[in-house]
Amino acid sequence: DNGSSPTGNSDVYRGIAAFSEPETQAIAFLIDQYPFSLALNYHTYGNYLIHPWNHIDEPCPDDESFKNIGRTYAQQNKFAIGTAQETVGYKTNGGSDDWIYAHDAGQKVYSMTPELGLQEDGFWPAKSRIRDLAKTTLKGNQLWSKMAHRYFELSILDPLYLIKSTDNQIDILIN
């Protein structure tokens, strides 16, 4: 019961069994049907960006990639990046990030959870706070959508290389 509860009126209710709730069934269907590369699962609160593994105390195989992608997302909002243990201070079970990342749907999906807002916002922020909270993730969401199709890092080590990019192609000319 780390980070979740079997009690229906709890803020961290997980359902009676894996995929027992219609929302989780819908997400599982989408992950199985479409070739996602990135996923964001919004929660409140803490101004964190949480990535797998969250159910155990060890880094996932792509821990460094998650941290690099997370730093890109958090450039504007300065969210703290890490696992649930590293950010909120406890492990969580039954989380969507761990399942989406580990699920073999034909490709790896980097799934992360932005936790929006401050402690005083709580799990259910006031309606008057929604717009400001949404603004904290706007730039990150825009960057995230750009990364969803093509994500790579390129360093020019030699000025003799000329790089030209179009939507579907990168040309490198060596002088």
Regions found by a protein language model. Give the residues of each.
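Intrinsically disordered or highly flexible coil/loop and linker segments, enriched in small
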Residues: F36, G82, M147-R150
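Extracytoplasmic/secreted proteins, especially bacterial periplasmic and envelope-associated proteins
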Residues: P22-F29, P35, E64-N68, T72, ...
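Structural beta-strand segments of beta-rich domains
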Residues: T166-I172
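Active-site/substrate-binding loop(s) of hydrolase catalytic cores
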Residues: D1-C60, H103, T113-P125
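Catalytic cores of processing enzymes, dominated by hydrolases/peptidases
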Residues: N54-L118
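Surface-exposed, proline-enriched loop/turn segments that connect beta strands in immunoglobulin-like
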Residues: I156-L160
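His/Asp/Glu-rich mid-to-C-terminal helical/loop segments that flank catalytic regions of hydrolases
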Residues: F123-S155
